[in-house]
Structure formats: structure tokens, C-alpha cells
Regions:
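Structural detector for short beta-strands of small beta-barrel domains
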Residues: 1-9
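Helix-rich effector regions associated with P-loop NTPase G domains
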Residues: 11, 28, 34-50, 58-75, ...
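Charged helix-capping and loop-helix junction motifs
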Residues: 90-93
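A conserved segment at the C-terminal end of the G1
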Residues: 164-180
Length: 292
């Protein structure tokens, strides 16, 4: 029987199957292989001694360690246009990590009823990243988010104060109740806020990821310097066009990326983020690279 993990607590995993949610444990072989099942994993269940066990884990598209979730399709990066002041560097780090993992980042601008979103809009208008402005008064932007959710596994990332909870409540007024209902069904009560829980909505799935509420970009993933240029999709048309092979797009002459920047075809703030991220990893040796 096949399904996907909706939650994992204390060595037990809860798998959504056509027959409902099944409590199970993984086979010991996974521990020997140093593989830990996580929410979002597509799995195959078998019965041993009358109990269900996870027998196979399908190959993952991607996996995040903090919080533990696999096979994400979309990561909504929630940012406020007022307080707290949005950090484009943090947003760019998270979006780059998402792209590097094969996840589509979507910038979501909240609190737009309090202030115009010109700062964020101008920072991302020349990027290829989708940008959604939310207006709770008119409901603008909510349908667009629902369209992104349809047919996909999504998560929301945003630090405290950016309005992530308000956004989720506007999208899913019953989400807290549904998450609680899942917890009650799993017999774990309400003290499960640290675990990832996946539930279905709008024809897709949403991973309730408390760890993304205070996510530290530097702990979310590591992109080596040779891959960093690919994590900024708007650089794509200019890659391979530079005068020198292995161009870092920072100081070299004949750099096509810098030329595009000078001609106004790329965002200065996005380019500055790229340079800052490059400087952080340029001297990191292979053996020093963190594992995620």
C-alpha cells in the first residue's frame, strides 16, 4: 500500500493512504542506511507481525533538514512591507536555496493594506520570481496563492511579525482546527507544534512547518560558489556569455551579468545579494561544506 507521510513523532510515522491515516514505524534498514523518514516522503507500507511498517521510501525530489520535510514543490516566502522591515538578503538566500533544491520560490508581500509595496516590488520586478501582493481588505492575491497550491506540496516561510499566521488564517480559516483534528486523530493532543504536519487544501497539500517561522537562512542549506549563479534564475540568459570561463560575475572584465546589470536588465539588490552570498562561500573547501 502506498501513501505519503503527514507527520512523524517520536519514531512513529503517520501515513495518508487511500484507506486513511496509518500509524507505522520504519524498517530498521533505514537506520543502518542513515535515512530518516520525514513528512512529505512518498512511501510503501507492508505488514509485519500484524503491524504496518514503512518498507520503501521513494526517491526524493528534495529534502529540508530544518524543518524536516521532503518533496516540496513551492516555498512561499512571506515578507511584510512595514514592520519588521523586509531583508532582501534573507529573502534572496532562501529563494536561492529553494531554487538549488528544485523548489519554486514565490515572494508574498503582506500588510499591503498598511503601506505600498514599492520597495519589494522594485527589488524583484526584474527577477523571474513570482511576486504576489496581498490585500486583506479586497482579498487580492489570495486566489493566486490558491492556484499555486493546486496540485503541489507547498510550505510557507516567514519570520515572526511578517503576517504569516494572518495569511494562513485568511486562506484557511479552519487550518488550525484541521491541524488540531489531525493531532487528535493521531492521539498526540495539542502539544505538537514543533512537528511538520501536512494537510490537503485547494487541490494540493500544505506543509504546516513551524520551523520555517524562525528559519535561519544560513542553516537552511548550503550552495557552493560554482552553483550559486544558477540559483539566481534571471542570470540564466547571460551565463556562458562572459569573456572568461568560470567568471564569478563580481570583478572580471567582459562579464555578461555585470553588463546586464549596468544596462538595467538586472536588479541591483538581487545582484548585491548574490555578491554577499558568494563572499560567504568563496573560501569554503569541499571538506568544510555543511551537510543538509
Amino acid at each position: 500500500m502506498n501513501g505519503y507521510i503527514v507527520k512523524g513523532i517520536g519514531g512513529f510515522y503517520y501515513v495518508k493512504t487511500p484507506d486513511g491515516i496509518v500509524e507505522c514505524k520504519p524498517r530498521g534498514i533505514f537506520r543502518k542506511q542513515k535515512i530518516t523518514p520525514v513528512a512529505g516522503d512518498e512511501v510503501t507500507l507492508e505488514t509485519e507481525n500484524g503491524a504496518s511498517v514503512i518498507a520503501q521510501i521513494a526517491p526524493r525530489k528534495n529534502v529540508f533538514v530544518r524543518p524536516p520535510v521532503a518533496n516540496l514543490d513551492v516555498l512561499f516566502l512571506v515578507a511584510s512591507t512595514t514592520q519588521p522591515t523586509p531583508s532582501t538578503l534573507v529573502l534572496d538566500k532562501l529563494s536561492a536555496i529553494a531554487v538549488d533544491k528544485g523548489v519554486q520560490p514565490v515572494i508574498v508581500c503582506t500588510k499591503s493594506d498598511l503601506a505600498e509595496a514599492e520597495f519589494l516590488r522594485s527589488a524583484y520586478e526584474k527577477s523571474t520570481l513570482p511576486f504576489i501582493r496581498i490585500d486583506y481588505g479586497s482579498g487580492a492575491g489570495l486566489d493566486e496563492i490558491k492556484q499555486w497550491i493546486s496540485g503541489r506540496l507547498c510550505a510557507f516561510c516567514g519570520n515572526s511579525g511578517v503576517g504569516k499566521s494572518t495569511l494562513l488564517n485568511a486562506l484557511l480559516p479552519d487550518a488550525a482546527r484541521e491541524t488540531s483534528a489531525i493531532s487528535q486523530k493521531l492521539g498526540r493532543g495539542r502539544h505538537t507544534t514543533r512537528e511538520v504536519t501536512i494537510f490537503e487544501a485547494f487541490g494540493g497539500r500544505i506543509a504546516d512547518t513551524p520551523g520555517f517561522a524562525s528559519l535561519e537562512a544560513n542553516r537552511a542549506g548550503f550552495i557552493p560558489k560554482e552553483n550559486l549563479e544558477h540559483a539566481f534564475p534571471e542570470f540564466g540568459p547571460y551565463l556562458g556569455q562572459c569573456q572568461f570561463t568560470g567568471c564569478s560575475h563580481r570583478t572580471e572584465k567582459g562579464c555578461a551579468v555585470r553588463q546586464a546589470l549596468a544596462e538595467g536588465r538586472l536588479s541591483q539588490t538581487r545582484y548585491d545579494s548574490y555578491c554577499a552570498m558568494y563572499d560567504e562561500v568563496k573560501d569554503v573547501k569541499d571538506w568544510q561544506r555543511p551537510k543538509f
